[in-house]
C-alpha cells in the first residue's frame, strides 16, 4: 500500500517525542524509526499539517501547524483512514484560583520544556522554587521528576494512597528517593493567589471509602482537615481527554460515532461507524501506556489490510516486518 502520515508537529512521534521524558523513551529512536519507514518502505510523512473537520479546534502543539487539511478531503482521496490522534487535552479542576498563570498541566509543562530543549522556542518554561504536582499517574511522576531536575523543591500530592497510584508503587518510591516529597490522601480545593500570582495551594485531607465506578476506593473529605503548601507553580496531572480531529457536531454530520468521553467508538476490528475509517491508541481508549497503544495500531493495520482485500476481492498476503 501507499501510506501517508499527517502530523501537526515538526517531528514525528507525538507524545513519545514531545512529552514523554527522554529517560523513558529516547526521542531519537522514535525519529529514526520514522525515517526508516520513509527510506525503506516509502511511507510519506507530512509534518506541520493539522487535520480538522469544519473549524479547527486549538490544542497543544497546533502552533507548529503550517497547513490544514479537512478530514472530508481525506475521505475523498484515500481508500482508508486511521485516526491515532491521542489525548492532547488536559483537565484542570474548577477550583478557586485555577485560572492563575502559574497553574498548568503536566502535559503542557513537559511539552513546553521539550520544545525549548529542541530549540523550537527561545522562551524558557517557568522555573519555580516550590512546585506542587497533583496526581498519581505517569504524567504526574514525569512532571515531578522534570521539576526536580530544574532545582525546585517538589511535592507530589495524590488523593488516594500510594497503593492506588496509577503509576505504581515502584515509580512513586523511586522519585521519593530522588527527593520528591509525596503526600497521599489529599485533594486540592483552592489555589491561593496574591495579585493574581500563585502563593500556595490549599488541600483537603481525605479518607478512603467504598469503591467508586472505577473500582478504586472513593476519596472522602475529612471535615476540618485542611492544610496548605507554599507554591509558586502548580502542575495538574489529573487526566487527559481524547482529541479526535473532529468534535461532536462535525462527527455527527460525517456519521462518525463518538463516545461520551470524546473517544472514538470502534468495533473489535478497530473500525469506526464509517467503514473506511479506523482508529487506534488513546483516542479510542483514553490515556493508556505505549505498549497497548502500539498494539491497537498494529491490530488496526491488519484490519485495514483485510478490509481492503475484501473490498477489492484481492487477498494480498500479510507479513510483519520487524524494523531495527
Where are these regions (language model features)?
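A conserved FAD-binding loop/helix module that cradles the flavin
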Residues: 280-314
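FAD-site-proximal beta/loop scaffold in flavoenzymes
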Residues: 99-128, 211-287
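Beta1-alpha1 glycine-rich phosphate/pyrophosphate-binding loop at the start
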Residues: 1-50, 58, 91-96, 142-185, ...
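Mid-to-C-terminal Rossmann-like scaffold of FAD/NAD(P)H-dependent oxidoreductases
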Residues: 174-178, 187-199, 207-209, 299, ...
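Rossmann-like NAD(P)H-binding beta-loop-alpha module
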Residues: 1, 118-152
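Short glycine-/acidic-enriched loop or helix-start segments at secondary-structure transitions
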Residues: 57, 92-94, 115, 143-144, ...
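Feature captures the FAD/FMN-dependent oxidoreductase FAD-binding
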Residues: 31-95, 190-202, 207-210, 231-235, ...
Amino acid at each position: 500500500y501507499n501510506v501517508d502520515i499527517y502530523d501537526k508537529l515538526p517531528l514525528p512521534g507525538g507524545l513519545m517525542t514531545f512529552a514523554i521524558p527522554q529517560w523513558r523513551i529516547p526521542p531519537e529512536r522514535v525519529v529514526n524509526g520514522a525515517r526508516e519507514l520513509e527510506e525503506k518502505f516509502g511511507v510519506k510523512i507530512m509534518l506541520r499539517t493539522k487535520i480538522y473537520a469544519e473549524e479547527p479546534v486549538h490544542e497543544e502543539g497546533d502552533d507548529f501547524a503550517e497547513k490544514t487539511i479537512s478530514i472530508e478531503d481525506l475521505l475523498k482521496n484515500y481508500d482508508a483512514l486511521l485516526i491515532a490522534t491521542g489525548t492532547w487535552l488536559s483537565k484542570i479542576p474548577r477550583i478557586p484560583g485555577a485560572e492563575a498563570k502559574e497553574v498548568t498541566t503536566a502535559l503542557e509543562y513537559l511539552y513546553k520544556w521539550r520544545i525549548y530543549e529542541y530549540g523550537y522556542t527561545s522562551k524558557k518554561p517557568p522555573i519555580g522554587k516550590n512546585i506542587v504536582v497533583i496526581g498519581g499517574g505517569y504524567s504526574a511522576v514525569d512532571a515531578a521528576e522534570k521539576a526536580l531536575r530544574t532545582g525546585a523543591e517538589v511535592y507530589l500530592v495524590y488523593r488516594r494512597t500510594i497503593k492506588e497510584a496509577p503509576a505504581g508503587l515502584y515509580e512513586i518510591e523511586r522519585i521519593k528517593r530522588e527527593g520528591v516529597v509525596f503526600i497521599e490522601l489529599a485533594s486540592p480545593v483552592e489555589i491561593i493567589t496574591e495579585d493574581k500570582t500563585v502563593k500556595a495551594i490549599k488541600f483537603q485531607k481525605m479518607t478512603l471509602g467504598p469503591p467508586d465506578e472505577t473500582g478504586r476506593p472513593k476519596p472522602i473529605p475529612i471535615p476540618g482537615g485542611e492544610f496548605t503548601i507554599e507554591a509558586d507553580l502548580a502542575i495538574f496531572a489529573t487526566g487527559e481527554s481524547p482529541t479526535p480531529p473532529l468534535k461532536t457536531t462535525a462527527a455527527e454530520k460525517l456519521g462518525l460515532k463518538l463516545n461520551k468521553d470524546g473517544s472514538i467508538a470502534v468495533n473489535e476490528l478497530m473500525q469506526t461507524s464509517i467503514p473506511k475509517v479506523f482508529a487506534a491508541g488513546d483516542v479510542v481508549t483514553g490515556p493508556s501506556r505505549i505498549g497497548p497503544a502500539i498494539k491497537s495500531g498494529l491490530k488496526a493495520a491488519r484490519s485495514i489490510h483485510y478490509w481492503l482485500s475484501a473490498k477489492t476481492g484481492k487477498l494480498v498476503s500479510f507479513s510483519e516486518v520487524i524494523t531495527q
